[in-house]
Each structure stands twice: as C-alpha cells, then as structure tokens.
From Swiss-Prot:
It comes from Dictyostelium discoideum. GO terms for biological process: regulation of nitric oxide biosynthetic process. One of its GO terms (molecular function) is ubiquitin protein ligase activity. It comes from the Eukaryota. Residues 127-175 have a biased composition (Low complexity). Residues 120-181 are annotated as: Disordered. Induction: Down-regulated by Pseudomonas aeruginosa, PAO1 strain and PA14 strain infection and by growth on bacteria. This is Nitric oxide synthase-interacting protein homolog. Its main location: cytoplasm. Transmembrane segments: none annotated.
Length: 333
C-alpha cells in the first residue's frame, strides 16, 4: 500500500489514519513494554514466581508441579494420537484392499463376457457349416451349378457372422465406456462443492505419525524427560542488602552478592544447580586448575554451564522481540 493512502485526504476524506487504527482491521502491531516481559525467575508455564524450581538443558525455568503435569499430559496426548494414526493406517489398508478386489472382479467379469461372446460365435458358425455341408452334398448329386450357388451362399453367411461378432463386441465396449464415464461424472459431482455453502471436506485429512517423545513446552523443539530436569538452588538476598526492600529482587549471586534480574545474564551449574551472574566467567578465567563450584566445591566443566533464559529488559538493545502482531481481515473503506 503506498504512503499517500495513509493520508486523511485519501478515499474521499472518509477516514483519517487515526480513525483507521481505531477500526483494528488488518495487521495491527504494538510495542511491548516491561510489564509484558517474563522475569527470569518466573515459571515458563504459569508465569508466576517459581515454586520448587527446575530447569531444562536449554535454560527454561519451570515450577516442578507445572512441568510434570505438562509432561504427563503430553504422554496421554501421544497415546491418543498413536491410536488415531493406527486406525487411519488400517483404514487406508482396507481401502487399498477393496480397490484391488474390485479391479480383480472387474477383470474377471470382462474376461467372462469375452468368453461368452466367443462361445456364441463358435456355436453359430458350427451350425451354419453343418447345414451348408448337407445342402452341398445333396446339391452335388443333383447339379454342379447348384454347388456354385451354395458356395456363394456360404460366403455370404460367413460375412454376416463376422459382421454380427464385430457389432456385438463394439456394443459391449461402448456400454462399458459409457458406464465408466457415468461413474466419473458422479464422482466429480460429489467432489464439487458450492462455494457459497459451508460444506465439509469430502476427503479425510491425512494423519501424520505422531512423535513418540515429550518436548519442552517453552519452545517445543528439543525433547525433554522428567529425569533430565535439574533442581535449581537460588541464593536469597541477605536482609542487610540495600536492594532487599524491593519485593521483585529475591535472589543474588553468591560470589559478588549482586541482585539478579533480567539485565544480568544468569548462569547455572548443571551438577549442583547453583545460580551465578556473569562473574562466573571471571572466576573461571582466574582459576588455572580444575573448575569447581564456589558454594559446594563440586567440580564442573565448561559444557555443564547453562544460561537461564529471560524475557529481556524492555529495551530494543536486549535482543528480544518487543513487537506483537495481530492478523485480522482488512476493511475496505
């Protein structure tokens, strides 16, 4: 749409740009604020403060009760979809068998029709030949001229028989072709739906084979089991801290005592479940020997560090998507 269509003078001055936005037709966009963004310490399912927090390998935080109920529901849904898929496969197999049987029966019927027509033609030829032979024997005793006449008659009879056989075969083939054309026309009429009437689809939708594993409900991409969940151990803010008056700031880093928020990149150790801020990287660089947790002294490797997923700070520089879109029908005004 060109830029001039947004002016108030477009479309005979009926609607201005502000009035069009009030209609809420077409694609509407809105900038998300800080209140619309999930906190790092809130559950990815219920969006409340976590109770008995657990985390997946990709850094999505959940309440233990929420994630377990979600995984159980996924297992139930998988069983239902597997039954539906099995029924659909049995239905396809049954339809395929029915088509093969029908084709086999049609081929048998066509073969029987051809055999019957050939038998009828052969019996008529035998009777005609016997009668002609008797007449020829009698006529041979009488006159040689009559023999010539009988031979001519036999030739005419044979020609008539061949014409009758060709006509019978052509008529049967024409009837079969007409029946096939009628069936095709009826099938097309069933498929054609009136565009102004709401009608259901004639064809059943194909059911794909369901997955046999549960996935993480936050993104739905990577598989997740209940045994893969990691218990999270946050460090509570001390009462002497200056930021303890804020109810949202509940947790801090055990190394630097910095209050954790969406602006701080929080990290978790996979073995013990303790949460740290970005100072864990500095602590990792300073230690030349084997890495160990600052709280419980458990050894860990760099691959066992998980970054906790957060919604962002509300600024565009955080890298998160801060624009929401809603698609509706366009208004012709």
């Amino acid at each position: 749409m060109p830029r001039h269509s947004k002016h108030s003078c477009s479309n005979s001055g009926k609607f201005s740009n502000y009035e069009r936005q009030l209609l809420k037709y077409g694609t509407t966009t809105e900038r998300l604020g800080k209140d619309s963004i999930k906190n790092f310490d809130s559950c990815s399912l219920c969006l409340n403060d976590v109770i008995m927090p657990v985390i997946c390998n990709k850094g999505h935080l959940y309440c233990k009760e929420c994630i377990l109920t979600s995984l159980i529901d996924q297992k139930k849904l998988i069983k239902i979809k597997e039954k539906e898929w099995e029924q659909y496969q049995n239905k396809l197999k049954y339809e395929q068998d029915q088509k093969q049987e029908k084709q086999h029966q049609d081929s048998i019927k066509e073969f029987e029709k051809n055999v019957i027509t050939l038998e009828g033609i052969g019996s008529n030829d035998d009777n005609n030949n016997n009668n002609n032979n008797n007449n020829n024997n009698n006529n041979n005793n009488n006159n040689n001229n009559n023999n010539n006449n009988n031979n001519n008659n036999n030739n005419n009879n044979n020609n008539n028989n061949t014409t009758t056989t060709t006509t019978t075969t052509t008529t049967t083939s024409d009837v079969n072709n007409k029946d096939k054309e009628k069936k095709e026309i009826v099938e097309k009429e069933i498929k054609l739906n009136s565009y102004w009437v709401i009608t259901p689809d004639n064809k059943d939708k194909a059911i794909e084979k369901p997955r046999s594993y549960t996935v993480c409900p936050a993104d739905g991409k990577h598989p997740l089991k209940s045994a893969q969940l990691i218990n999270v151990h946050f460090t509570n803010v001390k009462p002497s801290s200056s930021d303890s008056n804020d109810s949202n700031n509940q947790y801090c880093c055990p190394i630097c005592s910095k209050v954790l928020s969406n602006s701080t990149k929080t990290r978790l150790l996979k073995r013990c479940g303790h949460v740290f801020c970005s100072c864990l990287d500095k602590f990792k660089e300073d230690s030349s020997s084997q890495l160990s947790c600052y709280v419980c002294d458990k050894p860990y490797t760099e691959d066992e560090i998980i970054q906790i997923h957060s919604g962002g700070t509300g600024f565009s520089g955080s890298g998160s998507n801060l624009e929401a879109k809603k698609y509706t029908h366009t208004a012709i005004v």
